[in-house]
A protein has these predicted regions:
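P-loop NTP-binding module
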Residues: 1-185
């Protein structure tokens, strides 16, 4: 969500699509403006034909950021992501928003990221510092590339600079630099 927030801060509109229909965590993290009688519909509802696309996109408490939650858990999320409705959703996002960010489950847990990757411009591999092994990152990269997905880059998140051998240097340098008065720079 930090990436979506940064894009929105640049006056861009962003649609975040949560495709983790097995174990989503985004619905609990964001406050969506719900207008559908209190019920939050999501991707699984749309892809299974229960609701139309206009019923699943919600504004968030972040100006310019909209969300399409995963919806309820389903036994066949990969099959749903392979439907023409998912492709139509991506096309809708491209036409109506400056950016479409698609959040997928970890590739070690499911093949969903490779399926989604075929319908988007590319993938950004996100790894957690001191959690994600280098082997898992290499396997993820290989899985995506073998599926024809273009790798756009990588993000290391959950960083604790005080635990990093370089964090002390960068933290002190930039902290001191930005902490000085303009005439001292």
């Amino acid at each position: 969500m930090d990436l979506a927030r940064s894009m929105a801060d640049s006056k861009k509109s962003v649609l975040v699509v949560d495709t983790d229909m097995r174990k989503s965590v985004l619905v609990g993290r964001l406050r969506a403006k719900v207008e559908s009688g209190g019920k939050i519909y999501g991707l699984s509802h749309y892809l299974s034909g229960q609701v139309s696309l206009d019923k699943v996109v919600y504004a968030t408490n972040i100006k310019g950021v909209f969300i399409l939650f995963a919806g309820h858990e389903v036994p066949n999320p990969t099959e749903l992501l392979e439907t023409k409705e998912f492709k139509e959703l991506i096309e809708f996002g491209e036409k109506n928003f400056d950016y479409v960010l698609v959040d997928t489950p970890p590739t070690g847990a499911a093949i969903d990221a490779a399926v989604v990757g075929k319908n988007v411009d590319g993938a950004v591999i996100v790894a957690a510092q001191n959690v994600t092994s280098s082997r898992a990152i290499i396997n993820t990269k290989r899985t995506l590339e073998d599926s024809g997905v273009k790798i756009l880059g990588a993000v290391l998140n959950k960083c604790r600079f005080e635990e990093s051998k370089y964090g002390h240097y960068y933290g002190n340098y930039y902290g001191n630099y930005y902490g000085r008065d303009d005439d001292e720079k």
